[in-house]
Amino acid sequence: MSLGLISRFVPLLGLGFQYVVYTIVAEQYNLKLLNTDAIWVWVLAFLMYDLCYYWMHRIHHEVKLFWATHVVHHHGEDFNLSTAMRQTSTGFLWKWVFFLPMFLIGVPPAIYVTVAGLNLIYQFWVHTEHIGRLGWKIGRAHV
């Protein structure tokens, strides 16, 4: 239990750094391609977050250095929420880089935080054996 708490606490420390970097990118390097008042920006942000997350997760499976930090997530015998919560304590060092494109095109940090939270809820949902296969469009990519 205490190791699990540590693995959740360490990334929280990295959130401050991420917030500073994301804010700088959003304010100074933003290409301003999006009308942030439009509802479709929220949908685009959610889909873009999912795409960035997909590539981050895929690279963690294909690059040995990243796999070494990610493998703990796959060590459980059962596919459930406690297995999903097994995360590396060092991921905050590089995972944030994968989401920078969102800020470059103009997704505001507030929308990013919201869609990241929604994606986290989705990740809890797909990391359970109680939800069956949902088909290729929605189903789990790594089962």
What are these regions (language model features)?
Residues G16-V43:
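Juxtamembrane/interfacial segments at transmembrane-helix boundaries in multi-pass membrane proteins
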Residues G4-G14, A38-H142:
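Membrane-embedded catalytic scaffold of the fatty acid hydroxylase/desaturase
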